Each structure stands twice: as C-alpha cells, then as structure tokens.
C-alpha cells in the first residue's frame, strides 16, 4: 500500500512538472505574436516621382508602407519583404 502511494505521488509530480513546462511554452508563444502588433513594427513614408511623368502639374504621390506579418490589408498592395531581427514580414504599401 505504501508503494502505491509513493508511485502515485511520483506520477502526480511528473504530471505537474510537464504541465508547468507546457504552460511556459504557451506563455512564450503568446508573448511573441500578439495580434495588432504586426502593423506597428515598422512604418515607412516616402515621396515617389512615378506619377509626375503622367501629370502635367508634376505633383508627387505619397505612399505609406508597413511591414506586416502575414498578408496585406485590403487597400494595400504587396511590395516586397522586410527582414526585422531575422523575421520575414510582408512590405505592404498604399
């Protein structure tokens, strides 16, 4: 009877240790990829002369580009990729 109690205690201790390591892994994964952070990593604005040859007035178009994890939003177009701290993101411009 004492042996069964000791084996049960060892089994419970092993399950508890495994549950803690799984929780730590889940917490690490949750802190690495928070929704909403993806579009805040990098924002780039620049002037582009591409439309000035088509317009007589010579006005310049302004584009705003962001590095996003995953796909671009509806009104954005994919314009390349970004490498930030070894992670690859989509360069999305509008």
UniProtKB/Swiss-Prot annotation:
Gene Ontology process terms (BP): antibacterial humoral response; antimicrobial humoral immune response mediated by antimicrobial peptide; cellular response to lipopolysaccharide; defense response to fungus; defense response to Gram-negative bacterium; defense response to Gram-positive bacterium; disruption of plasma membrane integrity in another organism; innate immune response in mucosa
Keyword Secreted included in the entry's annotation: yes
Cross-referenced PROSITE patterns: DEFENSIN
Signal peptide boundaries: 1-19
Keyword Transferase appears in the UniProt entry: no
Recorded family membership: Belongs to the alpha-defensin family.
Protein name (database record): Defensin alpha 4
Species the sequence originates in: Macaca mulatta (Rhesus macaque)
Lineage, uppermost ranks: Eukaryota, Metazoa, Chordata, Craniata, Vertebrata
């Amino acid at each position: 009877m004492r042996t069964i109690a000791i084996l049960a205690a060892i089994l419970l201790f092993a399950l508890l240790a495994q549950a803690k390591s799984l929780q730590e892994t889940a917490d690490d994964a949750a802190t690495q990829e928070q929704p909403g952070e993806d579009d805040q990593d990098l924002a780039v604005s620049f002037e582009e002369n591409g439309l000035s040859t088509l317009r007589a007035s010579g006005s310049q178009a302004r584009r705003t580009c962001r590095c996003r994890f995953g796909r671009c939003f509806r009104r954005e177009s994919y314009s390349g990729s970004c490498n930030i701290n070894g992670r690859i993101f989509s360069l999305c411009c509008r």
